[in-house]
């Protein structure tokens, strides 16, 4: 059995590498004023839409949307104003929409809207490495698709699928959440509250609701 014993030079090199690594991680965690970070990230959406006024056949059975799990991914850049406040801008692909709870009129219903979102948020560090974030998020629908099985009233179900949907292309949301830095990693959880009506249907108003959880790796840019 061959055993390699580190000599003094190897020990110095190893100690230097450990020191440099810890220093880099420490610098990222300390939120020094005037620094920039770039954070690629990926995560999961739990998306749905609100529709408080839609009922089936004018009766008492209400159409209910449930949360749809889907992918989100993108990149964030953050400028640190001081040790307590950072300004962040993101470019995120976000798969949103809803799944429809089965009822007497529809089943297997779901909608998919592919958004390009641009969240602009302020991050308030109220504890070491822990920040509350709030801002505005304009979003632009790149693709829209809806499908469902519809009951014709006689017990027969017909499948419908269409990309010509009633979703508007622009969405504006209010992101509220928490970010936590673990060394160079950032875990982010936020709730995107849709502010504008995203449907062209005159009789109802529908808004996006998205719970979003991501993990990213922060790179120091200066």
Annotated model-derived regions:
Residues 40-44, 71-79, 91-93, 118-126, ...:
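Residues on the lipid-exposed face of transmembrane beta-strands in outer-membrane beta-barrel proteins
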Residues 1-37, 41, 215-221:
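Bacterial Sec-dependent N-terminal signal peptides
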Residues 49-65, 95-114, 142-168, 197-204:
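Flexible, solvent-exposed loop segments that connect beta-strands
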Residues 31-33, 82-84, 127, 183-185, ...:
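Outer-membrane beta-barrel channels and translocator barrels
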Residues 30-78, 194, 220-222:
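Short glycine/proline- and aromatic-enriched beta-strand/turn motifs that initiate or cap beta-hairpins
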Residues 90, 96, 159-222:
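Predominantly the C-terminal beta-signal and adjacent terminal strand-loop region
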Residues 86-132:
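Hydrophobic, well-structured mid-protein blocks that either form specific transmembrane helices
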Residues 34-38, 67-71, 112-116, 168-174, ...:
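Residues that define the transmembrane beta-barrel architecture of outer-membrane proteins
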């Amino acid at each position: 059995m061959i055993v390699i014993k580190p000599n003094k030079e190897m020990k110095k090199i190893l100690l230097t590498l450990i020191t440099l690594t810890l220093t880099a991680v420490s610098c990222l965690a300390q939120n020094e004023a005037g620094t920039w970070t770039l954070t690629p990230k990926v995560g999961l959406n739990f998306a749905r839409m609100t529709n408080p006024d839609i009922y089936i056949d004018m009766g008492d059975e209400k159409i209910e949307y449930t949360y749809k799990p889907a992918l989100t991914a993108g990149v964030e850049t953050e400028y640190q104003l001081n040790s307590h406040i950072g300004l962040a801008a993101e470019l995120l692909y976000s798969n949103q929409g809803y799944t429809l709870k089965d009822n007497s009129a529809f089943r297997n219903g779901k909608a998919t809207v592919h958004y390009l979102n641009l969240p602009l948020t302020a991050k308030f560090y109220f504890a070491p490495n822990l920040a509350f974030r709030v801002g505005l998020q304009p979003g632009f629908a790149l693709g829209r698709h809806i499908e469902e099985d519809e009951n014709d009233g006689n017990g027969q179900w017909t499948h419908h699928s269409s990309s010509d949907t009633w979703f508007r292309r622009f969405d504006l949301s209010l992101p509220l959440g928490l970010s936590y830095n673990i060394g160079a990693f950032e875990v982010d959880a936020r709730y995107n509250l849709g502010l504008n009506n995203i449907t062209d249907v005159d009789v109802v108003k529908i808004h996006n609701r998205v719970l979003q959880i991501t993990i990213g790796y922060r790179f120091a840019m200066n």
